[in-house]
Amino acid sequence: MENILKELKFDDRGLIPVITQDYKTNEVLMMAYIMKRPLKKSLETGKVHYFSRSRNKLWLKGETSGHFQLIKSISIDCDADTLLIKVEQVEAACHTGHYSCFYREISGNELKETSDKVFDEQKVYEAENAKILQEIYDVIVDRTIHPKEGSYTNYLFEKGLDKILKKVGEEAAEVIIGAKNRDKGEIVYEISDLIYHLLVLMVERGIKLEDIYEEA
């Protein structure tokens, strides 16, 4: 395995792009990233593991939905900087409910959907989204019980309520700026930051997620 890893050209973050294809039809299912550890895990288990840049963690495809990708073959391109993984796809690859993530086609000045959904993504992911928020909340609570040196969360708690409120205000302003710029990626990034700081504020004030859900 190590000799294969030496052949691959990972970028300065340790990532290498992966194109995933249906092994029967050769339909391109998705594009993602992988690191050495998830690649090893993929080869050990026969199921594709990626690296989630947004969550900064190893990610087993299908761990939430059950829509696993069973590996049939892995190829390396001529420059050794991209992988092609052919898989047997369980149900569908795309979190939107489509079989492939490439379900939209540029048609003139419009985007046209070229395939129907094969599952209801809201039913599949709704409970998981709430679970992710709870996991983040629990990590923040754990930082108050088991502080870690260099932890930004602990830094906020050490500085106190005024610092936390200042950060919430700053992040809310960043969301507004992102929205005015009409940049979806910027808005998503800033909203994520705002949600994190709101969760820190909730923990500091002793407010649980259940308290919020009851008001919804």
UniProtKB/Swiss-Prot annotation:
The reaction(s) catalysed by this protein are: 1-(5-phospho-beta-D-ribosyl)-ATP + H2O = 1-(5-phospho-beta-D-ribosyl)-5'-AMP + diphosphate + H(+); 1-(5-phospho-beta-D-ribosyl)-5'-AMP + H2O = 1-(5-phospho-beta-D-ribosyl)-5-[(5-phospho-beta-D-ribosylamino)methylideneamino]imidazole-4-carboxamide
Sorted UniProt keywords? Amino-acid biosynthesis, ATP-binding, Cytoplasm, Histidine biosynthesis, Hydrolase, Multifunctional enzyme, Nucleotide-binding
Give the residues annotated as coiled coil. none
GO biological process terms on file? L-histidine biosynthetic process
| InterPro entries, per the entry | His_synth_HisIE (IPR023019), HisE (IPR008179), PRA-CH (IPR026660), PRib-ATP_PPHydrolase-like (IPR021130), PRib_AMP_CycHydrolase_dom (IPR002496), PRib_AMP_CycHydrolase_sf (IPR038019)
Task: Write down a Pfam family by its short name.
Answer: PRA-CH
Q: Which CDD domains does the entry mention?
A: NTP-PPase_HisIE_like (cd11534)
What SUPFAM superfamilies does the record point to?
A: all-alpha NTP pyrophosphatases (SSF101386), HisI-like (SSF141734)
- Keyword ATP-binding on entry: yes
Reading the lineage from the top rank, the first entry is: Bacteria
Top-level class of the enzyme under EC nomenclature: hydrolase
Could you say which EC number(s) this protein's record lists? 3.5.4.19, 3.6.1.31
Q: Where in the cell is it found?
A: Cytoplasm
In this chain, the stretch annotated as Phosphoribosyl-AMP cyclohydrolase covers 1-132
Q: Where do the record's region annotations for Phosphoribosyl-ATP pyrophosphohydrolase lie?
A: 133-216
Query: Per the record, GO CC terms?
Result: cytoplasm
The record's GO molecular-function terms, alphabetically, read:
ATP binding; phosphoribosyl-AMP cyclohydrolase activity; phosphoribosyl-ATP diphosphatase activity
Query: Its pathway?
Result: Amino-acid biosynthesis; L-histidine biosynthesis; L-histidine from 5-phospho-alpha-D-ribose 1-diphosphate: step 2/9; Amino-acid biosynthesis; L-histidine biosynthesis; L-histidine from 5-phospho-alpha-D-ribose 1-diphosphate: step 3/9
Give the family this protein belongs to, as stated in its UniProt record.
In the N-terminal section; belongs to the PRA-CH family.
Q: Kindly give the HAMAP family that the UniProt entry links to this protein.
A: HisE (MF_01020), HisI (MF_01021), HisIE (MF_01019)
The name under which this protein is listed is Histidine biosynthesis bifunctional protein HisIE
Q: Which organism is it from?
A: Thermoanaerobacter pseudethanolicus (strain ATCC 33223 / 39E)
